[in-house]
Amino acid sequence: MTRKQRRLMLIGVCGAVLAVALGLVLWAMRGTIVFFRSPSEIASQAVAPGVRFRLGGLVQEGSVQRGPDGRVAFVVTDNGATVPVRYQGLLPDLFREGQGVVAEGMLEPGGMFRADTVLAKHDETYMPREVADALKKQGHWQGEAKHPGGTAPAPQTASGEKPALRQQ
């Protein structure tokens, strides 16, 4: 073999090894990739029962029902469609009706979503990106409040005074 043929053979073997390695990594990750869906997407698309995904939206007002042994049932909505959810376990402290939630689990044949994990928003301004995108897509996004003139009000102390700026 000439030097050029050996070099091409080495490049080909390296390319094949990289392709096999990439294939093995993707095959190993196939069970850990979980897609996000909103209630409207579930209603409009046929989601096969038993497929894991994340369901995101708002906890519908008046829908939370707590049962024995830590069982909880509630409804997730995006103001376009609703999906009933069943969960057994401890809910996050910030889980409330009307708040953003992301539940990970699978849809059962009857249309009930069985959640393994429930995540609640952690402060007043945070909403999971997927939930915000789904609400924007449905036209229900209210966004951040705009201040007159397009600027935020000046910060104030508890007594109403404006704090002095520190020089560095």
Curated annotation (Swiss-Prot):
Coiled-coil region(s): none
Highest taxon in the source lineage: Bacteria
Binding site for heme: H122, Y126
Signal peptide as annotated in the record: none
Gene3D superfamilies: Nucleic acid-binding proteins
A Pfam family the protein falls into: CcmE
Residues that span the membrane, as ranges: 8-28
One annotated Gene Ontology cellular component of this protein: plasma membrane
Keywords: Cell inner membrane, Cell membrane, Cytochrome c-type biogenesis, Heme, Iron, Membrane, Metal-binding, Signal-anchor, Transmembrane, Transmembrane helix
Subcellular location: Cell inner membrane
Periplasmic side: 29-168
Residue numbers on the Cytoplasmic membrane side: 1-7
Chain spans, region Disordered: 134-168
UniProt cross-references to InterPro entries, sorted A to Z: CcmE, CcmE-like_sf, NA-bd_OB-fold
Topology versus the membrane: Single-pass type II membrane protein
Stated family: Belongs to the CcmE/CycJ family.
Main function: Heme chaperone required for the biogenesis of c-type cytochromes. Transiently binds heme delivered by CcmC and transfers the heme to apo-cytochromes in a process facilitated by CcmF and CcmH.
UniProt name for this protein: Cytochrome c-type biogenesis protein CcmE
Taxonomic source organism: Methylobacterium nodulans (strain LMG 21967 / CNCM I-2342 / ORS 2060)
